[in-house]
Amino acid sequence: MKLAIVIINWNGIKLLKKFLMPLITHNNNENEIYVIDNNSSDDSIDYIKTNFPKIKIIENPKNYGYAKGYNEGIKKINADILCLLNNDVQVTKNWITPIMDEFKVNSTTAAIQPK
């Protein structure tokens, strides 16, 4: 099963600087990471391109907001599982394991979220 980690962003360079490195550190290299950018006017996109060239960037032509921003961006992602994260989420070691385990064990699972 292919999992894509997807982050929505709008002018979030300060948060990206704080939370992207732990995300990459605690990601196995099988999962692609995407940032859907809602037409940021800060240096978010340049920061990602310069410091994290493996992260895929999807640029929305305008700020669609949270839900529509995700909806527009995920149309361009090919994965079995979409893990939607805010840009201020700090992940920990093995955080992906229970997500993948649930989808592998229960074929009827459509969505999960933490407590």
Indicate residue ranges for each PLM-predicted region:
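A conserved acidic beta->alpha catalytic loop
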Residues: P22, D37-I45, K62
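Acidic helix N-cap motif at the loop->helix transition within catalytic regions
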Residues: K17, D42-T50
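Short beta-strand/loop segment that forms part of the nucleotide-sugar
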Residues: E30-N39, I58-N60
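Cell-envelope/extracellular polymer assembly enzymes that use nucleotide-activated donors
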Residues: K2-A4, E32
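Short aromatic/hydrophobic "clamp" motif used to bind/position activated sugar donors
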Residues: L82
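Glycine-rich, basic loop-to-helix element that forms the pyrophosphate-binding segment
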Residues: E59-I77
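Conserved donor NDP-sugar-binding/catalytic core segment of glycosyltransferases
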Residues: T92-K115
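Short, acidic, metal-binding catalytic loop of nucleotide-sugar glycosyltransferases
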Residues: M21-E30
